[in-house]
Amino acid sequence: MGDRAGRQGRGPIAGLVVAALVAAGCMAGGYDQGEPQQPAPPRSAQPESQTTRADGTTSVAEFKQDIQDAVRLAQRYWAEQFRASGERFTPIRRVVAYSREGEVACAGQGLPRNNAVYCSAGDFIAYDVNWSVAAFRQIGDAFLFYLLGHEYAHGMQVRLGIRYNFTIQQELQADCMAGAYLGDSVRSGALELEDGDLEEFREGLLAVGDDPDQPWFAEGSHGTAEQRSESFFRGYEKSLGACGLG
């Protein structure tokens, strides 16, 4: 997968930013319930014109590079969306890795293993590094771009003041937003997919889907694999306008 600065069209963001000033506090006490304090991984010094490619290796070095690339690409994408709408963009403060349950806390609550979350109280993304490396090796490097894109989308929901009554609505919208970020990045030339990357997205969504018997309205529901795939690829193919941002 690759990363090259690309120009985005005017997105459906402007009308939501004013509401965000009032509503952003709704999520300030906790974190999204994940798929699942250290400094953030250093930002890459690569020039913006360079294309990021996931080379398919499964080394720890490649994992770290893909995490950095995914965060940088998401930050650049959302900065462009806000800028195109004439709004100020504030990036998520940091991304932290952890390896033990409770090692990182959000609003006083220790984060569980085998997870990745966005903590609105601290405005950071945290992920279980052991779980993430295992998924990276089993599913592929494209999964990391989806995973970080999904969590980054939760941060954008907070900035836009988007809050639904049920968790599943919040989660499926974040899947759609992650799909839009990746699809738009591919179309603009900012991201270059390798053979098999789309299949890795599908496999990743299958891996994080809820049990089909999970109640739609249950707290913490994210959606079945089918629902999550539909939301992701709707955003991937149709961009942010298909994600119900306003």
Can you say where each PLM-predicted feature lies in the sequence?
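Catalytic Zn2+-binding segment of zinc metalloproteases
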Residues: Y152-I168, Y181-V186
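Catalytic zinc-binding patch centered on the HExxH motif and its immediate surroundings
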Residues: R100-A126
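Active-site recognition of the HExxH zinc-binding catalytic motif
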Residues: W78, Y146-R159, D175, G179
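Pan-zinc metallopeptidase signature
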Residues: D213-G246
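Short helix/loop segments within enzyme catalytic domains
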Residues: Q68-V71, Q75, Q81-R83, A178-D211
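Bacterial signal peptide processing site
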Residues: M27-Y31
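C-terminal motif of bacterial Sec signal peptides marking the signal peptidase cleavage site
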Residues: A23-G25
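Short pre-active-site segment immediately N-terminal to the catalytic Zn-binding motif
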Residues: V129-Y146, I162-I168
